Amino acid sequence: MDQPAVGDCIAHFTLQEVRPLAEYQAVGYRFVHASGMEVCFVENGDNEQFFSFVFRTLPEDDTGVAHILEHSTLSGSRRYPVHDPFITLDKSSVNTYMNAMTYPDKTIYLASSPLPKDFDNLLDVYADALFAPLLRRETFEQEGVRLVDDGKGGHWEGVVFNEMLGSANDHDSIVARGVSRSLFPDTCYAYESGGNPISIVDLSWERYKEFYRNHYASGNCRLLVYGNNDMRKILDMLDARYLHDAPHTEPLPAPRRSTTWKPDARVRFLAPKEAGGKRGDASVVLGWATEPADDSLSILTLNTIVDLLLDDPSCPLYKALLDSGLAEDISPESGMIADLRDMTFLVGFKGIDPARADEAERVILASLEQICQEGIGREAIESSLKRARFKQQEITGSVPMGLRILSRSVHGWMDGKGPFATMETAPVLDLLEKEIAKDCRYFEHWIEKHLLANHHRVLVSVVPDERYLVEQKHELDEKARAALNEGTKEENRRFQAFEDTADDPRVLATLPHLALSDLPLEIVPDAYDERSVAAVPLWWRKQFTCGIDYVTLAIDISDFTEEEYLPLTLYSRLLTMTGCGDLDSRAVSLAIKRLFGGFNVVTDSASDMRGRTNRGWFFVQMGFLSQDRDEALDFAARLLLGADLADPARIKVALGDLKGDFADSINYNATLFASQCASSVFTEAAQDAERLGGIVQWNWLAGIKESDYAALGKRMLGIQKLLCQRGRLVVGATSGDGALVDALSRFLGHFPAGRSQEAGRPFTLLRPDEHLKRTFALPSNVAYVSQVCRTPETTDRLQVAQTLLSQMLATGWLWNLVRMRGGLMALTPGRT
């Protein structure tokens, strides 16, 4: 279609604004429909098309109604009245992203695909689900909550109910929720938008439908569409099917600001207690309400302050809290939250005696005062801004570009400033640099104004309680007993009949889908050249990278003994947290931030195609600007060869940081831990993965005492010598500039010749006729189960059938059994 001009009307949508978006090589168009709906197109040549519907959803209680609607709107609609069109569609889609998410004050539905027909299918099904959902009682009971008469007093089931039994009881989630609830007590942020299990069971089907009517009107909807799209086709579809006869409605107002908050408040919350937990397992966090989240400069300012103060243990505030000795680590919730109307800044301790809460507050405030007095430092600021420029320049593929744009745009758009107000990052970086040039103490002044002199703050203590889960279960059981009546069994039979009734094949056939003929037949090869540089194998790929070099150093560790292998996860963490030669840990941290857009160290292992020969690899992944390549590679060689890995103080910091990450992730990633543990008895590669990142690794870390640090440091230095041998190295590199190859030759020349020992590590694998069950206790009312079976070799033709079987289980019979009927919150069949 011809490019529209401001004032043009297409399908009752009037074009209100056109904006060039140089950062995305795009043009932006903002349309407003007569019904009040706004649509923003970000048009460019990107074939990965993306869309996202956004509704302002303001909770008024802890029932999680917005979360339940997020699940259930996608479970049957006027055009597609099947049980689960979302999953049925996924069976024949090549989407690169498909999801829905509930935030504290909004709900987002989003998807992307590189195929135009697939994109159209996704948009078609999503639009019908959102504007014409069936909202059946059975869907509410399946996705939300239902009472089951089990003959033992009754119990509750439902997908969201079960999900929140896990996540709402997570210690760190209680910390973050406690801060928001206490800072904004008379607003929607005082409630849990995801739902609290105790309150979820109070939600009725009628209240659920009422919430939909109040929050899903067209005037309360914003739609972002990104990529190489047909604007007229999309606008015509929306108007013809859903908006043509819709009355004009205004968007719901932005959440009101709190007026009843108490200055310098102190609150205390309880959380589940782990078996064997101690009094010092509490969290104490200080949280502030700062500036509105609808201004890009304010968001970038606070984001940069978080990076400067808390990015790693060498940063001044992070270091000050660790040096205080009050706790094992800082709280993982430390940082900023920009998803509320006012941004919040949180910082505090985890693993602290709650009786020391006042002392914790004094340490935090005194540390901030000292930082402002001494200054953050020009080098730190320049390094942080350079990293921000790198991220803005980089072409990433980890998430769709449309999702990145949405995450920026939504701040200003939802507060009435339009979709472009907070969409671009480059102009805001320019503005921030100008502000710093005008005021060399720009960040210190912000801290003094918005933190030290700001009494809209709260000190939150979260204390583990061994009765927490018991009392929660007791209250839920009491509510179940009180709600049971003579009609409950009949309600259960009605629900089961609905679940047992298969979708009519003729109705299923109405769902749009892809055929094999819709898929491109051409396979784009991942082309690279195999070379040798400084006697090291090099996999070289030359392509446009926007002026960035990418280098992966792969170090063969297949011959490492178990004593050398187990410490590698800690080694990886310690490498970037310690000093090197005349550089202390802070100087190393700043050099990494200044020279590299990314510097990651990971360990992995893999079998050959038949699953027989195990190879372990220690990877160093680097990304840097081409103009910095010589300095970056020289520094990388210096760090890998000369990092001070025997420093007991840095070992303590790295160990605490790593243990904190394990403890924080165990509930959220419990299914992954279970799968990894169960898989570890089948192949050497899986057993190595368990050693490095599973329960075996956790037990090894938990067993390290402070008296072990000296011996551990010696072991780390021995590992360093083993790793840094040229005979172990393989390099992968990608750049638009062939001069990188010469730079790599100089880089590799720093490494001494040498090769492997013959030892290796033992493996204990399951015999073909053997079965094994293992159970671990968690502080949760939710169970996480993984079952792993032996399969044919990768080269066996049965693997093709097995791949298809995994997809069928994930979207078919097994999904229906455990999710649709059983109310499980997750099911992830797959093969390795």
Identify the residue ranges that each predicted region occupies.
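Non-catalytic terminal extensions that flank enzyme cores
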Residues: M1-F50
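C-terminal regions of mature proteins
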Residues: D2-P4, G227, S384-K542, N669-R767, ...
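Short beta-strand/turn micro-motifs at beta-sheet edges
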Residues: V39-V42, T96-N99, E210-Y212, A271-A275, ...
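His/Glu-based metal-binding/catalytic segments typifying zinc-dependent metallopeptidases
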Residues: V42-G45, S52-V54, F161, L165, ...
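M16 family metallopeptidases and their MPP-like homologs
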Residues: N47-L58, D84-A132, T139-L147, S173-I198, ...
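Active-site His/Glu-centered metal-binding helix of metallohydrolases
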Residues: V65, L69-T73, Y571
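Catalytic Zn2+-binding segment of zinc metalloproteases
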Residues: S72-V82, T578-L583
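Hydrophobic, small-residue-rich alpha-helical packing segments that form membrane-like cores
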Residues: R146-N220, L224-Y242, A246-K273, K278-G280, ...
